Amino acid sequence: YDKCVQILETTGLIGKANTLAGQLTLLERKRLELARAIATGPRVLLLDEIAGGLTDPEIQELIYTITSIRSENISIIWIEHIVHALMSVVERLIVINFGKKLDDGNPESVIKSPEIQEVYMGIGVK
């Protein structure tokens, strides 16, 4: 019971404990997915485009939840096309384009890379 309460608190779902999954908002369902994933006590969590379909304010709320999960000593590998969602929370950013690694490193330096700006962000494309 205590572990369930802790997971619900960590994922921001404590007030929804008795709500059916089908009655949850998209953000709440994403949080439920996270709660189910961390219930087994993983050391690593793989998130595959979890921000998809969310508005920017919802993405910020989701980031807060993911940051709470990280504070539980769970490493997170986050695959995402919405790069701005990652910038404030990742320690390392790897950009892959059609299976080829384009850059790997500190998020700020990766985003400033001319190749990344051209290929991924569409800046400077002729």
What are these regions (language model features)?
Residues G41:
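Conserved catalytic motifs of ABC-family nucleotide-binding domains
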Residues D104-G105:
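ABC ATPase "signature
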Residues L86-S88:
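A short, surface-exposed alpha-helical micro-motif characterized by mixed small hydrophobic
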Residues E80-H81:
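H-loop/switch region of ABC-family ATPase nucleotide-binding domains
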Residues L45-D48:
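Catalytic Walker B motif of ABC-type/P-loop ATPase nucleotide-binding domains
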Residues I7-E28:
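Conserved ABC nucleotide-binding domain
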